[in-house]
Amino acid sequence: MSPLACRQCGATDGPFTRDGLCENCEDGHPGWVDGLSADDYHADHTTISSSGLRALLPPGCPAQFKHDRDNPQAPKREFDLGHAVHTEVLGEGPEVDVLPFDSYVTKAAKEARDEARYMGVVPLLRHEWEQVQAMADAVRKHPVAGPLFAPGSGIAERSIYWTDPTTRVRCRIRPDWLKPAGEGRLIVVDLKTARAVDPNALQRAVYEHGYHAQAAFYLEGSKALGLHGDQEPAFIFVFQSKTPPYLVHLVELDFPALTLGAARNERALRIYADCERTGNWPGFNDRITYLPLPPYAEKRDQEEYL
């Protein structure tokens, strides 16, 4: 995208603010950008993302969120596989560099890995690349996921911006895949790799990682831009196991889960708006916390020792 373009909606006719926004985006108008790099998307401190909102709530807190936002961490190897699968399935994502090594034991392998990181690409060992190919193939062969991700049938990695009407906080999302499903309905798709994809494991993962809040936020953003046509949009998680045979499990959350997710987002937006307004980003508690044992531990010890 041209440097003389709004970094949110891509408009080139200006004028632009000091933050690189056009007048429409500065005034809170919704918009989207196709082709925005992931680095540019995540570097935006004028908007809040779903992961940012989740980080503001327990077990996180505003102080930790602000520190992490202002001090981005280096890429972690445990995310490399997922990033590479995204690129293979979606046709969009970080570039992958397949290194001619079986491990990172040798100095040459470590230097090649570090060089790839420096160049902003994802380094993979040969066997990791073979795994990525097998995982992508399993997605393509799935009777529902395969057609869902059919090349040319959707939009990958669109960056979407809007303003929350209650708090006036500027929000952003970046759906993995936007898929028109006929008769004007939109399907918002998120592809995730996981250790296990059985229903019990996915229930725990959704709650522990706040995926119900993510789904609600992405649906809200899609509707704010009117991308959903004349029907309510759907949000589908495509979970894939990282172990053979790389099972694929598609999940749509029920109404109570989405309602609770939206409620979490509303509270996090209020917290964020207050922190931005006051400049105060609190931790957990500035006073002494009176801390009991977890209920399960107290019950177990009472039965054992009292």
Model-found features: residue ranges?
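Short histidine-centered catalytic/ligand-binding loop motif
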Residues: 70-74, 117-124, 199-210, 254-256
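Conserved catalytic cores of phosphodiester-cleaving nucleases, focusing on short active-site segments
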Residues: 173-204
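Short cysteine-rich clusters marking metal-coordination/redox-active sites
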Residues: 6-9, 22
